[in-house]
A protein has these predicted regions:
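An extracytoplasmic/periplasmic, membrane-proximal ligand-sensing/linker region
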Residues: 32-34, 176-178, 217, 240, ...
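Stable alpha-helical elements in mature extracytoplasmic
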Residues: 46, 50, 54, 79, ...
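A ligand-binding cleft/hinge motif common to bilobed small-molecule-binding domains
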Residues: 100-109, 175-177, 203-236
């Protein structure tokens, strides 16, 4: 998902306008030179925007430039490879997301083991996806949709932004937990998938909330539920899918990670400073503009989320026989 150029520039301008925080004096001699923050997606999407907000904050807090380095491709695995190939010295970091966990389970022969080669540093943001349908679909609720899908196995078309994508897996988890058969049709990105959904050639889609808000508000698409465990502040009257499928959670999270064996004191320093940013009202507001909720906590908290999602998505792919082509 990409944001319009005007929105993207507005958010970047907002990052530059964040109040300069005093540099933290610490005995730790880090950083003494620029730090690279690798992003596995092109400029303009939420991952890139979150990275630039955090990079700007850390640059001001720690007195050295944190430079965003976009390495898009292969479900963010190219970006991960750049980090696991770098020295474990804290000068090459990764803006990681749910996509990396899913890609690590989906693709074969990646040349790295994500859970062994990457150490989670700190969460940054949590955001929901939304399950939307074309208005021609008669179902007005999740239970109605499940009933229709059971009555018409293999006939309801589920569009996604591509094979192995996070939105596809949100749909696959729904299919598995609801025990329904939807026909998955992958597209080359959100734009063509949305075109067919709006045109009625596809029936249902799971996608990031910022992409869908305008279509939902204008009635061009009907929202049935959000993929997070709880409701979203953006659409508080919209139920979570988990209210009807207990345990369903396909949250999209973003955070900062480093090469494994990065010194613990560097990990702890970065965690402390990122949490300080997430507690800053201006930075928190910027995250909210792209649908994010601050994901505060220790590196151990983030590691627990990281490990839990790795297990969940790997088990889903095995149980549902989802394999890369």
């Amino acid at each position: 998902m990409r944001f319009p150029r005007r929105t993207f520039l507005h958010l970047l301008a907002g990052a530059a306008a964040l109040p300069a925080a005093p540099r933290i004096a610490a005995a730790l001699d880090y950083p003494t030179r620029p730090v690279r923050l690798v992003v596995g997606f092109p400029p303009g999407g939420p991952t890139d925007i979150f990275a630039r907000l955090i990079a700007d904050w850390l640059s001001k807090r720690l007195g050295q430039p944190f430079v965003v380095d976009n390495r898009p491709g292969a479900g963010s695995t190219i970006g991960v490879q750049a980090v696991v190939s770098a020295p474990a010295d804290g000068y090459t970091l990764l803006l990681i997301s749910t996509s990396a966990i899913i890609s690590a389970a989906y693709y074969r022969n990646l040349g790295f083991d994500l859970t062994q080669d990457i150490v989670p540093v700190c969460g940054v943001s949590l955001e929901p996806m939304v399950m939307v349908v074309n208005p021609s679909v008669t179902a007005k609720s999740i239970p109605d949709f499940i009933a229709d899908a059971k009555a018409n196995p293999g006939k309801i078309v589920m569009a996604s932004v591509g094979n192995g994508s996070t939105p596809q897996m949100a749909g696959e988890l729904f299919k598995y937990m609801a025990n329904v058969d939807l026909l998955h049709v992958p597209y080359q990105g959100a734009a063509p998938a949305l075109t067919d959904l709006l045109g009625g050639r596809a029936n249902v889609m799971f996608e990031a909330m910022p992409t869908l808000v305008g279509y939902i508000q204008t009635g061009k698409l009907r929202a049935l539920g959000v993929t997070t465990a709880t409701r979203s502040a953006v659409f508080p009257d919209l139920p979570s899918i988990g209210e009807f499928l207990p345990g369903y959670d396909a949250s999209v999270w973003f955070g900062v990670a480093a090469r494994s064996q990065t010194p613990r004191d560097i990990v702890d320093l970065l965690n402390k400073e990122i949490n300080a940013g997430l507690n800053d009202p201006a930075l928190s507001a910027r995250l909210g503009e792209v649908g994010g909720t601050p994901l505060k906590g220790s590196s151990a908290d983030f590691e627990k989320l990281f490990a839990g999602d790795s297990k969940k998505w790997s088990e889903l792919m095995a149980a549902a026989n989802i394999k890369s082509e």
